[in-house]
């Protein structure tokens, strides 16, 4: 078990050098990095308001509203003000499908203005940052565009009380393909996925980061007990929901295993959870756009080495991948994208 004296081993491997993207950080330095900066005055006012009004803030939907039912909790798509008409039209099949299922008062097409913080976006639409009013800004939000259009900090702030997703593709055709895929899946007469959760967690020799993620995260989730205790499968979340588990942990967490799961070559999982290093590349490296955030597999031979055979990148996912209905969690450095500029590791 880690102790309070241990340095923090941050997730991420440099795709050029094969070394840690950021060296281990001592706790004092980490505390300094985590201290509020820039918008600290707003954060302080927000903290004080929460302290003074604890009973007024639930960060939740109104009493009696079922969050698992979009018809009650509401759904909205959020476009940047400058989103092209082509992208908007590409998503129209999905928007029309949602409109047909959700009452008009709980369905919205919203606009995000450039540079707008989350609380101003919500205020402009008549909603607070805390509690959810589905008829104003619903519980389910779909942001359209990359972090250069709608910043990550806006997404994270909205996520305090809402279920927020994001679509970011390069072309209108890709948005259209996504929309058509979702509508086809939801209108299908049968569910193609199996009631199975896939668990993928490499552990590299001499790497404290993946030792912790494999032993303290993936194994307890997959087996219902820490790595140093006997498995208790009946205690797992998957078992309680009557899902089977298929695990690839430590030596089994290969690139081939993950690609097989993603392409649905055997059993098509309904849920996939991975915990690994993600790759990071310098700004002037041609591989940054294609391979940033790629998942480092057990095939990696160790510090100082790096080849495409060691990781799973977007380019490894072929057009015949059977991803329909898959809910995937990629716990990795840059696993959800890369902001510009990167401020995560700066003090």
Regions found by a protein language model. Give the residues of each.
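Pre-catalytic or accessory/regulatory segments outside the catalytic core
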Residues: 1-155
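Cysteine protease catalytic core and zymogen-processing segment of caspase-like enzymes
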Residues: 162-174, 280-347
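A domain-level signal for caspase-like cysteine endopeptidase catalytic cores
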Residues: 20-25, 31, 37, 54-55, ...
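Short alpha-helical segments and helix-capping/turn motifs at coil-helix boundaries
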Residues: 58-64, 120-130, 134, 181-184, ...
